[in-house]
Amino acid sequence: GKRPQKVRRYFMNFRYFLGAIISIPLLPLLYFQGKNIRKRIPKLPEAKNPEGSVNTHFNETLHLLTIGESTIAGVGVDFHQNGFTGALAETLSNRLKKHIQWKVYAKSGYTVKHVCTKIIPKIKERSFDMIVIGMGGNDAFTLNSPKKWISDIERLVHLLQINYPATPIFFTNMPPIKEFPAFTKSIQFVIGNLVEILGKELQNFTKNKEAVFYFNEIITLQK
Protein backbone atom coordinates (compact mmCIF):
# COMPACT_ATOMS: atom_id res chain seq x y z
CA GLY A 1 0.00 0.00 0.00
CA LYS A 2 0.90 3.68 0.07
CA ARG A 3 1.87 3.80 3.77
CA PRO A 4 4.78 1.29 3.61
CA GLN A 5 5.97 3.10 0.49
CA LYS A 6 5.89 6.46 2.33
CA VAL A 7 7.79 4.93 5.27
CA ARG A 8 10.37 3.44 2.89
CA ARG A 9 10.79 6.77 1.08
CA TYR A 10 11.15 8.59 4.41
CA PHE A 11 13.81 6.06 5.45
CA MET A 12 15.70 6.52 2.15
CA ASN A 13 15.62 10.30 2.51
CA PHE A 14 16.71 10.00 6.14
CA ARG A 15 19.64 7.81 5.10
CA TYR A 16 20.55 10.35 2.43
CA PHE A 17 20.48 13.28 4.88
CA LEU A 18 22.42 11.26 7.46
CA GLY A 19 25.03 10.60 4.76
CA ALA A 20 25.00 14.29 3.83
CA ILE A 21 25.59 15.30 7.47
CA ILE A 22 28.49 12.83 7.72
CA SER A 23 29.93 14.21 4.48
CA ILE A 24 29.71 17.92 5.48
CA PRO A 25 33.17 17.85 7.16
CA LEU A 26 34.43 16.03 4.06
CA LEU A 27 33.01 18.53 1.54
CA PRO A 28 36.12 20.76 1.19
CA LEU A 29 38.19 17.58 0.95
CA LEU A 30 35.81 16.08 -1.65
CA TYR A 31 35.95 19.32 -3.64
CA PHE A 32 39.78 19.38 -3.83
CA GLN A 33 40.00 15.63 -4.39
CA GLY A 34 37.44 15.92 -7.20
CA LYS A 35 39.44 18.74 -8.84
CA ASN A 36 42.67 16.73 -8.58
CA ILE A 37 41.01 13.64 -10.05
CA ARG A 38 39.68 15.70 -12.96
CA LYS A 39 43.22 17.01 -13.60
CA ARG A 40 44.74 13.53 -13.40
CA ILE A 41 42.20 11.73 -15.56
CA PRO A 42 42.37 12.77 -19.22
CA LYS A 43 39.05 13.99 -20.64
CA LEU A 44 38.16 11.17 -22.98
CA PRO A 45 36.08 11.82 -26.09
CA GLU A 46 32.67 10.25 -26.64
CA ALA A 47 32.19 7.50 -29.23
CA LYS A 48 31.42 8.37 -32.86
CA ASN A 49 28.65 7.08 -35.17
CA PRO A 50 25.61 7.07 -32.83
CA GLU A 51 23.50 4.81 -35.04
CA GLY A 52 23.93 1.43 -36.64
CA SER A 53 22.52 -2.04 -37.17
CA VAL A 54 23.37 -5.64 -36.37
CA ASN A 55 22.64 -8.85 -38.31
CA THR A 56 20.66 -7.40 -41.22
CA HIS A 57 20.06 -10.94 -42.58
CA PHE A 58 17.30 -11.58 -40.00
CA ASN A 59 13.78 -10.96 -41.33
CA GLU A 60 12.35 -9.15 -38.30
CA THR A 61 13.74 -5.79 -37.13
CA LEU A 62 13.81 -4.40 -33.58
CA HIS A 63 14.42 -0.66 -33.17
CA LEU A 64 16.51 0.12 -30.08
CA LEU A 65 17.02 3.52 -28.44
CA THR A 66 19.69 4.06 -25.77
CA ILE A 67 19.78 7.21 -23.62
CA GLY A 68 22.13 8.29 -20.84
CA GLU A 69 25.40 9.62 -19.49
CA SER A 70 29.06 8.61 -20.07
CA THR A 71 28.62 4.81 -20.34
CA ILE A 72 25.91 5.15 -22.99
CA ALA A 73 27.84 8.05 -24.61
CA GLY A 74 30.71 5.60 -25.14
CA VAL A 75 33.37 7.64 -23.34
CA GLY A 76 36.78 6.14 -24.10
CA VAL A 77 35.46 4.02 -26.99
CA ASP A 78 36.17 4.87 -30.65
CA PHE A 79 32.78 3.94 -32.16
CA HIS A 80 29.42 3.17 -30.55
CA GLN A 81 29.36 -0.23 -32.23
CA ASN A 82 32.33 -1.15 -29.97
CA GLY A 83 30.70 0.33 -26.85
CA PHE A 84 27.68 -0.36 -24.64
CA THR A 85 24.99 0.01 -27.32
CA GLY A 86 26.84 -2.06 -29.91
CA ALA A 87 27.40 -4.89 -27.41
CA LEU A 88 23.77 -4.74 -26.25
CA ALA A 89 22.49 -4.80 -29.85
CA GLU A 90 24.70 -7.81 -30.66
CA THR A 91 23.45 -9.72 -27.58
CA LEU A 92 19.78 -8.90 -28.29
CA SER A 93 20.15 -9.87 -31.95
CA ASN A 94 21.71 -13.25 -31.15
CA ARG A 95 19.13 -14.06 -28.48
CA LEU A 96 16.02 -12.82 -30.29
CA LYS A 97 17.18 -13.77 -33.80
CA LYS A 98 16.27 -10.28 -35.00
CA HIS A 99 17.96 -7.52 -36.97
CA ILE A 100 18.65 -4.68 -34.46
CA GLN A 101 18.56 -1.09 -35.68
CA TRP A 102 20.00 1.10 -32.90
CA LYS A 103 20.33 4.81 -32.12
CA VAL A 104 22.20 6.52 -29.25
CA TYR A 105 21.24 9.82 -27.60
CA ALA A 106 23.66 10.42 -24.72
CA LYS A 107 26.01 12.99 -23.22
CA SER A 108 28.79 12.60 -20.68
CA GLY A 109 28.20 14.68 -17.53
CA TYR A 110 24.42 14.87 -17.91
CA THR A 111 21.99 14.34 -15.02
CA VAL A 112 18.42 13.06 -15.53
CA LYS A 113 17.24 16.69 -15.50
CA HIS A 114 19.67 17.51 -18.36
CA VAL A 115 18.42 14.50 -20.33
CA CYS A 116 14.80 15.70 -19.96
CA THR A 117 15.56 19.24 -21.13
CA LYS A 118 18.44 18.77 -23.59
CA ILE A 119 18.23 15.26 -25.06
CA ILE A 120 14.54 14.26 -25.22
CA PRO A 121 13.57 17.26 -27.43
CA LYS A 122 16.28 16.20 -29.93
CA ILE A 123 14.88 12.69 -30.49
CA LYS A 124 13.12 12.90 -33.83
CA GLU A 125 12.40 9.20 -34.48
CA ARG A 126 8.77 8.32 -33.85
CA SER A 127 9.04 4.57 -33.35
CA PHE A 128 11.16 2.36 -31.07
CA ASP A 129 10.57 -1.19 -29.82
CA MET A 130 12.84 -0.90 -26.77
CA ILE A 131 14.34 1.98 -24.77
CA VAL A 132 17.39 1.45 -22.52
CA ILE A 133 18.50 4.19 -20.11
CA GLY A 134 21.81 4.39 -18.19
CA MET A 135 21.86 7.13 -15.52
CA GLY A 136 22.83 7.72 -11.88
CA GLY A 137 26.51 8.66 -11.71
CA ASN A 138 26.15 12.39 -12.33
CA ASP A 139 23.05 12.66 -10.14
CA ALA A 140 25.13 11.18 -7.31
CA PHE A 141 28.10 13.49 -8.01
CA THR A 142 25.81 16.54 -7.91
CA LEU A 143 24.45 15.22 -4.56
CA ASN A 144 20.91 15.00 -5.92
CA SER A 145 18.50 13.91 -3.15
CA PRO A 146 16.52 10.65 -3.58
CA LYS A 147 13.27 12.67 -3.67
CA LYS A 148 14.53 14.96 -6.46
CA TRP A 149 16.08 12.00 -8.31
CA ILE A 150 12.75 10.14 -8.44
CA SER A 151 10.93 13.33 -9.41
CA ASP A 152 13.35 13.73 -12.37
CA ILE A 153 13.06 10.03 -13.28
CA GLU A 154 9.27 10.31 -13.19
CA ARG A 155 9.43 13.25 -15.60
CA LEU A 156 11.79 11.37 -17.94
CA VAL A 157 9.53 8.30 -18.03
CA HIS A 158 6.46 10.51 -18.58
CA LEU A 159 8.11 12.32 -21.52
CA LEU A 160 9.12 9.02 -23.13
CA GLN A 161 5.70 7.43 -22.60
CA ILE A 162 3.99 10.40 -24.29
CA ASN A 163 6.08 9.80 -27.43
CA TYR A 164 6.37 6.00 -27.19
CA PRO A 165 3.30 4.78 -25.22
CA ALA A 166 3.70 1.07 -26.01
CA THR A 167 7.51 0.85 -25.75
CA PRO A 168 9.08 -0.92 -22.73
CA ILE A 169 11.70 1.15 -20.85
CA PHE A 170 14.69 -0.53 -19.18
CA PHE A 171 17.02 1.20 -16.71
CA THR A 172 20.51 -0.29 -16.45
CA ASN A 173 22.11 -0.86 -13.05
CA MET A 174 23.98 1.94 -11.29
CA PRO A 175 27.70 2.68 -11.90
CA PRO A 176 30.08 1.00 -9.38
CA ILE A 177 31.50 4.23 -7.90
CA LYS A 178 32.85 2.34 -4.85
CA GLU A 179 35.13 0.33 -7.12
CA PHE A 180 36.61 3.06 -9.32
CA PRO A 181 40.33 3.03 -8.43
CA ALA A 182 40.78 6.68 -9.54
CA PHE A 183 38.43 7.86 -6.77
CA THR A 184 39.62 8.48 -3.23
CA LYS A 185 38.18 6.56 -0.25
CA SER A 186 36.05 9.54 0.84
CA ILE A 187 34.56 9.98 -2.65
CA GLN A 188 33.96 6.22 -2.89
CA PHE A 189 32.21 6.29 0.51
CA VAL A 190 29.94 9.34 0.06
CA ILE A 191 29.13 9.12 -3.66
CA GLY A 192 29.19 5.30 -3.70
CA ASN A 193 26.61 5.06 -0.92
CA LEU A 194 24.43 7.72 -2.54
CA VAL A 195 24.50 5.83 -5.87
CA GLU A 196 23.24 2.71 -4.06
CA ILE A 197 20.43 4.70 -2.38
CA LEU A 198 19.40 6.19 -5.74
CA GLY A 199 19.42 2.66 -7.20
CA LYS A 200 17.08 1.38 -4.47
CA GLU A 201 14.74 4.33 -5.05
CA LEU A 202 14.72 3.57 -8.77
CA GLN A 203 13.95 -0.08 -8.08
CA ASN A 204 10.99 0.89 -5.86
CA PHE A 205 9.75 3.34 -8.50
CA THR A 206 9.78 0.78 -11.31
CA LYS A 207 7.88 -1.82 -9.23
CA ASN A 208 4.67 0.20 -9.60
CA LYS A 209 5.12 1.08 -13.26
CA GLU A 210 3.84 -0.85 -16.21
CA ALA A 211 6.46 -1.59 -18.88
CA VAL A 212 9.25 0.15 -16.89
CA PHE A 213 12.02 -2.10 -15.53
CA TYR A 214 15.25 -1.78 -13.54
CA PHE A 215 18.16 -4.19 -13.54
CA ASN A 216 19.11 -3.90 -9.88
CA GLU A 217 22.24 -6.03 -9.60
CA ILE A 218 25.13 -3.99 -8.17
CA ILE A 219 27.94 -3.96 -10.73
CA THR A 220 31.47 -4.82 -9.74
CA LEU A 221 34.43 -4.12 -12.00
CA GLN A 222 35.27 -7.83 -12.09
CA LYS A 223 32.10 -8.46 -14.15
Set out the residue ranges of the language-model regions.
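N-terminal secretory targeting modules
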Residues: G1-L65
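Conserved SGNH/GDSL esterase-like catalytic core that processes O-acyl groups on lipids
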Residues: H63-L65, T71-S151
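Generic structural signal for well-ordered alpha-helices
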Residues: I153-V157, G199
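A short helix->loop->beta-strand "cap" motif at the edges of active sites that frequently abuts
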Residues: Y164-P168
